[in-house]
């Protein structure tokens, strides 16, 4: 098995998939960012804390060092988590699609 050929095929196919879904990926990322900023503003966090918290929440890591206390912020947190799961799912699906393509089309 030639890993170099598979790797190149995977990267080309993955890049193609990202290019095709870029508007959706960008929209999800902006949604996470803007909703995180809204939560941060409501909670009195700095811009950096808001951005940090929104991406920690979107990736479902959730360290717990920052947490929303207001009801509206908590509802937005659920929405951010949903957007993050959707974004992660799309990226994983693209990776699986690209890997499957690379394995099927690379000789050897």
Regions found by a protein language model. Give the residues of each.
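Pore domain of cation channels
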Residues: 49-107
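Membrane-interacting alpha-helical segments
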Residues: 4-15, 19, 48, 52-59, ...
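Pore-domain transmembrane helices of cation channels
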Residues: 1-41, 86-102, 107
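Outer-pore turret/helix-boundary of cation channels
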Residues: 22-55, 67-73
């Amino acid at each position: 098995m030639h890993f170099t050929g598979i790797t190149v095929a995977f990267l080309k196919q993955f890049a193609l998939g990202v290019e095709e879904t870029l508007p959706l990926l960008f929209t999800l990322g902006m949604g996470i960012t803007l909703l995180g900023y809204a939560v941060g503003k409501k909670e009195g966090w700095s811009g950096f804390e808001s951005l940090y918290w929104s991406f920690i929440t979107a990736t479902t890591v959730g360290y717990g060092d920052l947490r929303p206390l207001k009801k509206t912020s908590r509802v937005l947190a659920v929405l951010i988590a949903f957007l993050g799961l959707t974004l992660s799912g799309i990226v994983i699906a693209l990776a699986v699609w690209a890997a499957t393509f690379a394995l099927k089309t690379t000789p050897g």
